[in-house]
């Protein structure tokens, strides 16, 4: 299970000491990546430069309400600092307003900025209908994104087995599906993987892989 996990710390009050611990835990447990806010990308890339742990960061986070130009710049800047993977929040207002062409153009622009780097599109599934989730999956696939992702972990809910199944059924085997938000136990993580998740974002990653109860609340 370890290699499914993006070991995550996205809190506003995260300290460098906590980020160092995150990196060291990811290295020790061989998690797929660390997922951190953009300001820590360069630091994590340097700390993990002799490991296989990837550097994942978030764009337009957590509301998705930045303009496309800002998201493109964020993406380019993060990659220049050492990011391997980009988790971008879709504009939820545009989804609710049905501005599908605008959404698709934004994803295309950000994927172009990513180049060969991997792009995940965050939906915030707790705010959407199943129909909207399916529509976003199809748009993300057509726009060239590599993954679809459930949640930021900062809204009214996180990943559910039902949404993971729906997303996997929609995108097929050609794309990744990331479960994030509220995945805090080994049993929950395994349920997400069994439902079709190819990546799991979690702050309780060490507890998940050791089977121990998480000691704090988090992503």
Swiss-Prot record:
CDD domains, A to Z: DeoC
EC numbers for this chain: 4.1.2.4
GO cellular component: cytoplasm
One GO MF term: deoxyribose-phosphate aldolase activity
Keyword field: Cytoplasm, Lyase, Schiff base
Pathway(s): Carbohydrate degradation; 2-deoxy-D-ribose 1-phosphate degradation; D-glyceraldehyde 3-phosphate and acetaldehyde from 2-deoxy-alpha-D-ribose 1-phosphate: step 2/2
Protein's GO biological process: 2-deoxyribose 1-phosphate catabolic process; carbohydrate catabolic process; deoxyribonucleotide catabolic process
Gene3D superfamilies in the record: Aldolase class I
Keyword Cytoplasm tagged: yes
Catalysed transformations (reactions): 2-deoxy-D-ribose 5-phosphate = D-glyceraldehyde 3-phosphate + acetaldehyde
Entry annotation: catalytic residues: 87 (proton donor/acceptor), 149 (schiff-base intermediate with acetaldehyde), 178 (proton donor/acceptor)
RNA-binding as UniProt keyword: no
Source organism, top-level taxon: Bacteria
Localisation per UniProt entry: Cytoplasm
Function: Catalyzes a reversible aldol reaction between acetaldehyde and D-glyceraldehyde 3-phosphate to generate 2-deoxy-D-ribose 5-phosphate.
Family, as annotated: Belongs to the DeoC/FbaB aldolase family. DeoC type 1 subfamily.
Record protein name field: Deoxyribose-phosphate aldolase 1
Organism taxonomic ancestry: Bacteria, Pseudomonadati, Pseudomonadota, Gammaproteobacteria, Vibrionales
Gene name, Swiss-Prot/TrEMBL: deoC1
């Amino acid at each position: 299970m370890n290699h499914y996990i993006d070991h995550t710390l996205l809190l506003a009050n995260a300290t460098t000491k906590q980020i160092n611990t995150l990196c060291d835990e990811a290295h020790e447990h061989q998690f797929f990546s660390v997922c951190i806010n953009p300001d820590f990308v360069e630091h994590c890339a340097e700390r993990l430069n002799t490991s296989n742990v990837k550097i994942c960061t978030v764009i337009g986070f957590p509301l998705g309400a930045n303009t496309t130009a800002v998201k493109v710049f964020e993406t380019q800047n993060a990659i220049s600092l050492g990011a391997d993977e980009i988790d971008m929040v879709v504009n939820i207002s545009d989804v609710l307003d049905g501005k599908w062409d605008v959404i698709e153009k934004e994803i295309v622009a950000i994927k172009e900025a990513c180049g060969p780097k991997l792009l995940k599109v965050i939906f915030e599934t707790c705010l959407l209908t199943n129909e909207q989730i399916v529509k976003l999956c199809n748009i993300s696939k057509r726009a060239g994104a590599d993954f679809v992702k459930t949640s930021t972990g900062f809204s009214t809910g996180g990943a559910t087995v039902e949404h993971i199944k729906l997303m996997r059924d929609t995108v097929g085997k050609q794309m990744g599906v990331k479960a994030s938000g509220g995945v805090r136990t080994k049993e929950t993580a395994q349920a997400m993987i069994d439902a079709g998740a190819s990546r799991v974002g979690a702050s309780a990653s060490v507890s998940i892989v050791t089977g121990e109860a998480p000691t704090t609340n988090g992503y």
